[in-house]
Amino acid sequence: MQCEEKPVTERVVLAYSGGLDTSVAIGWIAEETGAEVIAVAVDVGQGGEDLDVIRKRALACGAVEAEVADAKDEFADEYCLPAVKANALYMDRYPLVSALSRPTIVKHLVAAAQKHGATTVAHGCTGKGNDQVRFEAGIVALAPGLKCIAPVRDYAMTRDKAIAFCEEKRLPIATTKKSPYSIDQNVFGRAVETGFLEDIWNAPIEDIYEYTSNPAEPREADEVVISFKEGVPVAIDGRPVTVLQAIQQLNERAGAQGVGRIDMVEDRLVGIKSREVYEAPGAIALITAHQELENVTVERELARYKRQVEQRWGELVYDGQWFSPLKRALEGFIDEANQHVNGDIRMTLHGGRAVVTGRRSETSLYDFNLATYDTGDSFDQAAAKGFIDIYSLSSKIAAKRDLA
């Protein structure tokens, strides 16, 4: 007598934060699809609850398995560092705080799906934000056969319904004291949106900030020296640091001076404009220092072209194309351009600003004897006349024609 084979139950890997929406999503997905849910929480320095507490909550909410990953160093080394080397500021202002964390999380979601034989990955994004694209474009780039679902978008899991579901199932998660804001944070920065900020005339209030102190409050300035090797921050005030430690220390020191506050209306990937408030003290301090060291060490034509590459790199990352061939190719160029970005940058952190006050580098292209206007100037000014004649020749020829 042959035994009947037990049908294989489909499995869904869920990007789990430990909050109400993703806790409810565990049971919601199970009811809507009949699948078993595996919860995966990834620590990218967002702070908050202990990872083991989050893991146990996922199991209590119905996950058949729950995994947590401490990815802080990975996030800093493999995602934040390339952004620093690229001086990445979307629309010249936003240091890609959320956009950088999504591919980190995606990598762990895909690994969990492959480990547990899941066919689908789920996330908690809405249908009008950038993150749904970042998650799903990243997932299919790493595992083209995986399907993606978003309960809020695909199954109309509104917050009211989520609260009712939570109370009905008696899930171990609070349903009160909901912030009026949508907040996303990691070690590279913090993003705040919605609530009264949706009226773009309303000024942000101090209560929304956590990573930065009020820059208007009087306090003594803080001087810091950041050392780089090939574009990588390797020391602060002469003490060796990892990339993660550099970000964390500058978050604390620059944040205490109110550095890194950004209030902007940005162009979202989905076609709308959105008002966002960011705090990124460590990111802004590092990018400011790195840019200045590049000014000292990178040849002019390379520096000019790199600025174009930086903008495109930032757009690709913002648009969820972290794993794209173009982004990888541009990163190769950026790494090459950073080969001689070595040295120290001295900065004063005060009043919401990170101001560079000193630069030194063994690979500097700054030649004092060529730059000085004092005695000892080695610049051959006699060569300037002939250079100008040749440089302006094409304009001179065109002017003769156009003004005739």
From Swiss-Prot:
UniProt: L-citrulline binding residues? 94, 130, 134, 182, 266, 278
Location relative to the cell: Cytoplasm
Its GO CC terms?
Answer: cytoplasm
Q: Which HAMAP family match?
A: Arg_succ_synth_type1
Task: Fetch the SUPFAM superfamilies from UniProt.
Answer: Adenine nucleotide alpha hydrolases-like (SSF52402), Argininosuccinate synthetase, C-terminal domain (SSF69864)
The family classification in the record reads: Belongs to the argininosuccinate synthase family. Type 1 subfamily.
Q: Which CDD domains match?
A: ASS (cd01999)
Task: Spell out the Gene3D superfamilies in the cross-references.
Answer: Argininosuccinate synthetase, chain A, domain 2, HUPs, Single helix bin
Q: Which cysteines are joined by disulfide bonds?
A: none
Per the record, the pathway is:
Amino-acid biosynthesis; L-arginine biosynthesis; L-arginine from L-ornithine and carbamoyl phosphate: step 2/3
Q: Main EC class of this protein?
A: ligase
Which Pfam family, any one, appears in the UniProt record? Arginosuc_synth
- The UniProt annotation places ATP binding at 15-23, 124
Q: What is this protein called?
A: Argininosuccinate synthase
Q: Record's PROSITE patterns? A: ARGININOSUCCIN_SYN_1, ARGININOSUCCIN_SYN_2
Where L-aspartate is bound, by residue? 126, 130-131
Query: What is said about its interaction partners and assembly?
Result: Homotetramer.
Q: According to the UniProt entry, what is the EC number of this protein? A: 6.3.4.5
- Keywords attached to this entry: Amino-acid biosynthesis, Arginine biosynthesis, ATP-binding, Cytoplasm, Ligase, Nucleotide-binding
Please write the reaction equations for the catalytic activity of this protein. L-citrulline + L-aspartate + ATP = 2-(N(omega)-L-arginino)succinate + AMP + diphosphate + H(+)
Q: Which InterPro entries match?
A: Arginosuc_syn_C, Arginosuc_syn_N, Arginosuc_synth, Arginosuc_synth_CS, Arginosuc_synth_type_1_subfam, AS_cat/multimer_dom_body, Rossmann-like_a/b/a_fold
